[in-house]
Amino acid sequence: MAVANLTSEQAVLNEVARQDRNRRAIRIWLGCVLLALFALVLVGGATRLTESGLSITQWQPIHGVIPPLNAQEWQEEFDLYKRIPQFQLLNKDMTVDEFKGIFWWEWAHRFLARAMGVIFGVPLLFFVLTGRVERKLWLPLGGIFLLGGLQGAIGWWMVSSGLQARTDVSQYRLATHLVTACLIFASCMWFMRALSPHSNEPAPTRYSAKLAGLIAFMSLFQIYLGALVAGLDAGMSYNTWPLMDGAVVPGGLFVQSPGWINFFENPKMVQYVHRLGAYALFAVVAVNMIISLRAAAETTHARRSVVLFVLVLIQAILGITTLLLQVPLHLALTHQAGALIVFGFAIANWRGFYGEYPRQTVIAVRD
């Protein structure tokens, strides 16, 4: 009987070790996905800031992987661009060589987006077929893959808004595209953190997890507002801080009718709300840090609250500097990168309060 018990216990240990190896492999894979998503979002930001997003006027998911390879193909691509309002109203003097500059940004963004399907889908299929993914993860991970496919359609829906009557894309569709990318990013971060070892330390207060969730949602809302700012070029509305052209509440916030539309289409109002959102997020993160340090200063949870505060502080400094310098490309992209880092850490911090993802039990030890 002792030998049987020893054998059963060893089998359990072997199974736990196998699950540990599998979870580590999945964490590494999701980490690579997160890095690729991070790069994709930044290239997308550069595409918007350089006004390159309308340079490719067709959606060809397969054939579009291959860029123009000779002078004739470049001219054909340029001729397609000449048909849209952006060229006719803003870029009538553009040459083929200048067109190549904006084309490559949009092509790179689409190429990375297609590559994401391979980076996510192929390893997922391998992990499922070889039994490395626990069954209860099949549905959520498959859902992330499908959301990635939907994101491709949303991207074209966004681009198509600027091909007929506009010289740029709709800020509503731009915000939808960016928020969807962030939801994919958050989902990957959530499950990577869930499959990681967790501290057994109790939360500093009974409200800590809810506060962490609030911070994550506020971070996402700030990214949404930032997309509206980018879509409307609202960063150029006021380039002073802390006042907005000498006023705490500037004029011109409600010049459109109906009044609610100013929150989405008035560049001055959109920048104003983005500032207020930043102040609110900073305040909540600061309060969260103070509460955590007072309640349980030596815990991992408290240390995470300090890191989160520092990240938000850096992001605030980046945002102010970007504003004061009138939105230079390198600072605007750094600010966007900072937003994604803050959001990603906020998601990881939130998930850290719920412990490691329950393990799949397949072996029982008998007395």
Curated annotation (Swiss-Prot):
Query: What is any Pfam family matched here?
Result: COX15-CtaA
Location within or outside the cell: Cell membrane
Give all cystine bridges in this chain. Answer: none
Please tell me whether the keyword Nucleus is annotated for this protein. no
Citing just one GO molecular function, the answer is:
metal ion binding
Binding-site list for heme: 274, 335
Entry annotated with the keyword Membrane: yes
Pathway the protein acts in: Porphyrin-containing compound metabolism; heme A biosynthesis; heme A from heme O: step 1/1
Family from the record: Belongs to the COX15/CtaA family. Type 2 subfamily.
Task: Write the protein's name.
Answer: Heme A synthase
Lineage summary: Bacteria, Pseudomonadati, Pseudomonadota, Alphaproteobacteria, Hyphomicrobiales
Gene coding for it: ctaA
